[in-house]
Amino acid sequence: MARLIYLMGPSGAGKDCLLSALRNATPQNRVVAHRYITRPADAGAENHVALSKQEFIQRAEQGLFALHWQAHQHCYAIGIEINLWLQHGLDVLVNGSRAYLPEAQRRYRHQLLPLCLTVSPAILAQRLRQRGRENSEQIDARLQRAQHYQQQLPSHCLQLCNDGELQHTLNQLQQLLTLDTPLSDPVEDKPCN
């Protein structure tokens, strides 16, 4: 059965870099979906489809999104094209929201494989400071939010630590994706310490 691999993690965990590396190394039976976001195309590292707020609302009303949510003053969506890809037997990776995971699970049930990219608090704080988008108060809030969500992950959520080199994390991800883990059974958690 094709899987919807729902990648989550805090800002600064390296999701965009990991998905970009995976796009370049992806086998033919796996695709990485682009997100539709109400922010400029050149904002951040993510390769996304930029929409105005009005375009986003119109597409949502027309049923063109499989999943959509709001976070950090922006709207995010995954297009309905993922349903066609899944029907064709392709595994689909998406950059999802931790807060939206219950809705994604409701919609995709046993097809959904939750995967959380984790980073130790010290490294996450360092990365957030280096990118320079937030002040220290906002960074503290992001760190608290990351810790809260880490504690709330479901037991069947795979965890992948991204404290080291990107290539190492990519290799680990590719190994995880080749496993035939039943999607409804719990798997061993491997958080960062």
Curated annotation (Swiss-Prot):
<comment type="pathway">
    <text>Metabolic intermediate biosynthesis; 5-phospho-alpha-D-ribose 1-diphosphate biosynthesis; 5-phospho-alpha-D-ribose 1-diphosphate from D-ribose 5-phosphate (route II): step 3/3.</text>
</comment>
<comment type="similarity">
    <text>Belongs to the ribose 1,5-bisphosphokinase family.</text>
</comment>
<dbReference type="GO" id="GO:0006015">
    <property type="term" value="P:5-phosphoribose 1-diphosphate biosynthetic process"/>
</dbReference>
<protein>
    <recommendedName>
        <fullName>Ribose 1,5-bisphosphate phosphokinase PhnN</fullName>
        <ecNumber>2.7.4.23</ecNumber>
    </recommendedName>
</protein>
<dbReference type="InterPro" id="IPR012699">
    <property type="entry name" value="PhnN"/>
</dbReference>
<dbReference type="GO" id="GO:0019634">
    <property type="term" value="P:organic phosphonate metabolic process"/>
</dbReference>
<dbReference type="InterPro" id="IPR027417">
    <property type="entry name" value="P-loop_NTPase"/>
</dbReference>
<keyword id="KW-0067">ATP-binding</keyword>
<feature type="binding site">
    <location>
        <begin position="9"/>
        <end position="16"/>
    </location>
    <ligand>
        <name>ATP</name>
    </ligand>
</feature>
<dbReference type="InterPro" id="IPR008144">
    <property type="entry name" value="Guanylate_kin-like_dom"/>
</dbReference>
<keyword id="KW-0808">Transferase</keyword>
<keyword id="KW-0547">Nucleotide-binding</keyword>
<dbReference type="GO" id="GO:0005524">
    <property type="term" value="F:ATP binding"/>
</dbReference>
<comment type="function">
    <text>Catalyzes the phosphorylation of ribose 1,5-bisphosphate to 5-phospho-D-ribosyl alpha-1-diphosphate (PRPP).</text>
</comment>
<dbReference type="InterPro" id="IPR008145">
    <property type="entry name" value="GK/Ca_channel_bsu"/>
</dbReference>
<dbReference type="GO" id="GO:0033863">
    <property type="term" value="F:ribose 1,5-bisphosphate phosphokinase activity"/>
</dbReference>
<dbReference type="Pfam" id="PF00625">
    <property type="entry name" value="Guanylate_kin"/>
</dbReference>
<dbReference type="GO" id="GO:0005829">
    <property type="term" value="C:cytosol"/>
</dbReference>
